[in-house]
Regions:
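Bacterial N-terminal signal peptides
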Residues: 8-18
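Bacterial N-terminal signal peptides that target proteins for export
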Residues: 1-7
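Intrinsic disorder/low-complexity detector
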Residues: 7-8, 479
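Compositional signal for N-terminal targeting/processing segments
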Residues: 17-487
Length: 487
């Protein structure tokens, strides 16, 4: 994945006019500042990636952001920072660092709430039904909002049951030739696969028996040429040798739109349709979700949430079976419910109940903060992207270095979200040094939110996650957290 060329174009499109007005300068001057900011951002990211540990890379990124207050830099670099915040499991800050306002547009279709012909359905049941008459299903995502990957992860099994057998992900590197046989992604598998939900999407596809491919352009092409090359790569790897294939695609934003001008030409989806002459089901997931500021939500979003109070992603389908989409170019739009935060983490990490919360606190960090906690599947190598990770720190992750001396709470706590099974749990510092490790098992039933029993650095003992205990039965350092156990 090559994020920079598309990044600049998108920021100009989404944010440029608003910022130009506020800074009273010409559009050309503002664009020049953004280009300069993009070059700085790329250089900072390259420097950060020289660090061995992900946490050290994040430290470089966050302090670079704090240290440069130029509005053009903060807008551009905010997206870079948000990627790394998502990589370390800091999903709330990732959403805040780069938020795209979803304004009403002239070609928006009327709200389905105003049409009695349309009814809301759980996306998990409606989309597989809608996909039955299609040979390809395209999902899009907002790269810094892993919420927009969660439904795709949950749908892979249902689509596999409908005969879909190829999974193409924009982010997967074609150079990772061992991905299929290995069965899990590593840091060399892709750019966004460094984020645990994205990695879980690829891992799930592999586990279900999909043939997983990457299709990003290998040349330096941009715009329409890049879209066309992506489409050719999918055709060469899938339909050229398997004309009866059924394909699931994960791509960013408008790469999946089926009509209209995209980056001065056509989208990847449009180019692919011309090559294979099949009509995909296109599922839009980046416009109708809760933003950090409600002023960034699409005007349809709030009224729908207040009326329906959903607890899972929804789509609208007419009585005649036709799905509703917000804009032309897509077949169906997904509405994500407002997120619920538990111990500083969104509960959508539970993937609709497939994963359980597992309590962790800073006692095992031995006063080394920030401290990265990761859980890897026991049957995967140490190079695997973890099933989940979270950073424990007594100061906010967007704080400046001087704030660290003010911190008094040395036992920050949070939750990891894990499927039933066995894991290797590790705590490490910014240098990548392991501070504590333990084997844990998540039971198939119950709320797995009880902390494992204390161990030592390098300890390989096993702990079993149990349902929430009463506050009195737990160590004093954990009793404050217990109050939120069943929220």
């Amino acid at each position: 994945m090559r994020p920079t060329p598309i990044l600049i174009v998108l920021v100009f499109t989404w944010l440029g006019c608003r910022c130009t007005a506020s800074h009273a300068q010409s559009a050309a001057e503002w664009q020049a500042r953004q280009v300069e900011a993009a070059q700085k951002s790329e250089a900072i990211m390259l420097d950060a990636n020289k660090r061995a540990s992900l946490l050290a890379q994040f430290q470089v990124m966050r302090y670079a952001y704090i240290g440069n207050k130029d509005p053009a830099f903060q807008i551009i670099f905010g997206q870079y920072l948000s990627w790394y915040q998502s990589f370390i499991g800091d999903y709330q800050d990732a959403a805040t660092s780069f938020s795209i306002r979803q304004e009403a547009l002239p070609d928006d279709r009327p709200s389905p709430l105003d049409n009695p012909e349309f009814g809301a359905e759980p996306a998990l049941t409606a989309i597989p039904r809608l996909a039955r008459n299609h040979r390809a299903v395209f999902f899009n995502e907002a790269h810094n909002i892993p919420l927009t990957r969660t439904l795709t992860v949950q749908l892979l099994g249902k689509l596999r049951a409908e005969g879909f057998n190829y999974f193409a992900a924009e982010t997967v590197y074609q150079t990772d030739t061992g991905l299929q046989s290995r069965g899990y992604p590593t840091k060399d598998s892709g750019f966004y696969t460094k984020e645990p939900i994205c990695a879980e999407m690829v891992r799930t596809a592999l586990r279900l028996g999909y043939k997983v491919i990457g299709y990003e352009a290998l040349s330096n092409a941009t715009g329409n040429a890049r879209e066309a090359e992506q489409a050719r790569n999918i055709y060469q790897q899938v339909f050229k040798h398997d004309p009866n294939a059924k394909l699931v695609v994960d791509a960013g934003y408008a790469h999946i739109q089926e009509s209209g001008v995209y980056l001065g030409g056509s989208s990847m989806a449009e180019h692919l349709e011309k090559l294979i002459h099949i009509d995909p089901l296109t599922v839009e997931q980046t416009m109708l979700y809760e933003h950090p500021s409600s002023s960034d939500d699409h005007p349809y979003y709030g009224p729908a949430m207040r009326k329906l109070h959903p607890e899972e992603p929804l789509v609208f389908v007419s009585k005649a079976g036709k799905p509703w989409s917000l804009r032309p170019g897509y077949d169906v739009s997904v509405w994500f419910p407002p997120q619920v935060i538990r111990r500083s983490r969104p509960t959508w990490l539970g993937l609709g109940g497939e994963r359980k919360p597992y309590y962790v606190d800073g006692g095992r960090c031995n006063r080394h903060f920030p401290c990265l906690v990761e859980a890897r599947y026991a049957n995967e190598g140490s190079d695997a992207i973890p099933a989940d990770r979270v950073v424990l720190d007594p100061v906010p992750l967007n704080a400046v270095p001087s704030d660290r001396v003010k911190a008094s709470d040395l036992h920050p706590f949070s939750d990891l979200y894990l499927r039933p099974g066995k894991y290797r749990l590790t705590y490490s510092d910014a240098d990548g040094t392991t501070l504590f490790s333990q084997n844990i098992a998540i039971k198939d039933q119950g709320d797995a939110s009880l902390e494992a029993q204390p161990g030592h650095a390098g300890d390989s003992s096993t702990a079993i996650a149990e349902p929430c205990a009463s506050a009195g039965s737990r160590p004093a350092s954990q009793q404050a957290a217990q109050a939120s156990c069943n929220r």
